[in-house]
Amino acid sequence: MPIWVDADACPKPVKEILFRAAHQRQILLTLVANQYIAVPASPFIKSLQVSSGFDVADNHIVASLVAGDLVITADIPLAADAIAKGAAVINPRGQEYTKDSIGARLNMRDFMETMRSSGVVMQDGPPPFSQQDRQSFANALDRWIARQRKI
């Protein structure tokens, strides 16, 4: 039950939660990014730097994961691809994406992208990462780990 992290934009508090969980529960954790990501010394944690380029890290994650793995990402298309391969997906704010919810998220993302590119919608991006987001992520990760332990 490895965990794959789309690490380029992953908030530091989320990485810290993942580092602790991987080490304490002996879960393989791989952070994939197109830049160097420092990780603590642990046989369960590794950082993988891929070449720069559009979706290179995303494509590596999708190619490497197997059904039952967990992917941490805020990237909706990556989440959709991971779910299609049978992975579980949680975003850094603790939202779990599923086969039932990802289609609507993709449609909304595409709609908003169209609106932004036509100049109709101006958006400053997501709100700052909060303590509530941190707690929501930790809770979602704990739920996933508990489900894996029952299998």
From Swiss-Prot:
Signal peptide: none annotated. Belongs to the UPF0178 family. This is UPF0178 protein CJA_1978. It comes from Cellvibrio japonicus (strain Ueda107).
